[in-house]
Amino acid sequence: MELVITGSNNKVSVSDAVFGREFSEDLVHQVVVAYRNAGRAGTKAQKTRSEVAGTTKKSKKQKGGGARHGALTAPIFVGGGVTFAAKPRSFEQKVNRKMYRAAICAIFSELNRQGRLMIVDSFDIEATKTKGLIEKLKGMDVGKRPLIVTEEASEHLYLSARNLPYVQVRDVQGLDPVALVGADTVVITADAVKKVEEWLA
């Protein structure tokens, strides 16, 4: 498979296994959910009725009218415990390496089919200027949420995009499924394409 490099008549040969794979929504969904869950702190904690501070003495007489109640730490009372109290836990899910890479390939392939994958020779800016990056992106028609992927991290590019909340800059090693799925357009350099193929092939 050959893909056109934007802004020139040149083409780059890419692997069908990486950029021409059939899209599996179930696979991508499972990997994206697992990736996001791995980032959860899992520190939420509530108290059960046995952990709440307070006496367990019976609050009122058994007889004499009114409802029958025991301790005021029961969940039905204000200040009482929580019935099914949340406890700190890990939300991590196991995702096999083969499965993770297959999902990344499926995402790249779908981006290519939808015309949301833009390959460029290079993506350099002369100085660390946010204004310069904005002007460059405006001329490329990349939508509101572009993801710029380079072979190696560029300090100029990273610092220029830091003040732009919807613009992400990653090198190939920093790619993840959530960033790829959430981007309107993925702008990737030709060198980065080769590195992606080495990683996923």
From Swiss-Prot:
Record-annotated disulphide pairs: none
Gene Ontology MF, one: structural constituent of ribosome
Keywords: Ribonucleoprotein, Ribosomal protein, RNA-binding, rRNA-binding
Top-rank taxon: Bacteria
Pfam families, sorted: Ribosomal_L4 (PF00573)
One of the protein's GO biological processes: translation
One GO CC term on file: ribosome
Region annotated Disordered, chain positions: 44-68
Cited function: One of the primary rRNA binding proteins, this protein initially binds near the 5'-end of the 23S rRNA. It is important during the early stages of 50S assembly. It makes multiple contacts with different domains of the 23S rRNA in the assembled 50S subunit and ribosome. Forms part of the polypeptide exit tunnel.
Quaternary structure, from the entry: Part of the 50S ribosomal subunit.
Family the UniProt entry places it in: Belongs to the universal ribosomal protein uL4 family.
Name this polypeptide is given: Large ribosomal subunit protein uL4
Lineage of the organism: Bacteria, Pseudomonadati, Pseudomonadota, Gammaproteobacteria, Lysobacterales
